[in-house]
Amino acid sequence: MSVYDLLIGQDHIVETLTAAVNAAASGEESQEMTHAWIFTGPPGSGRSSAAIAFAQALVCKQKGCGTCNECITAKSGAHPDIEILKSEGLSIKIDEIRELLTRTAWAPSMGGWRVVVMEDADRLTESAANALL
């Protein structure tokens, strides 16, 4: 079992994400994790599923085993170091981003990473996007 099991037919994506998790876990300065990843594609292509699986793998001590406490907690949506931001209306407003930035400044609770998956980032208002930058 793996956190990537739901990414059927996306072997090249799984390889890329697995390599990134392994590189980040190596601790080598030349392999540091980038501050952001963008998952693009048409609706139904698995963007959110891939991003969430990647987040789960980052917080897992076994790099995405799918069976440990971190993976189970992340899969249930209750992991304190993974936050999924979805637009509640037609747009993501600056107040939501300001609250998010406050929370993301905290150190990770259970692992080495604090991960935010932002669904529908194209719905950010201009001021919200600027605050995020």
Describe each model-derived feature in a short phrase.
Residues 1-127:
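P-loop/Walker A NTP-binding region and its immediately flanking N-terminal helices
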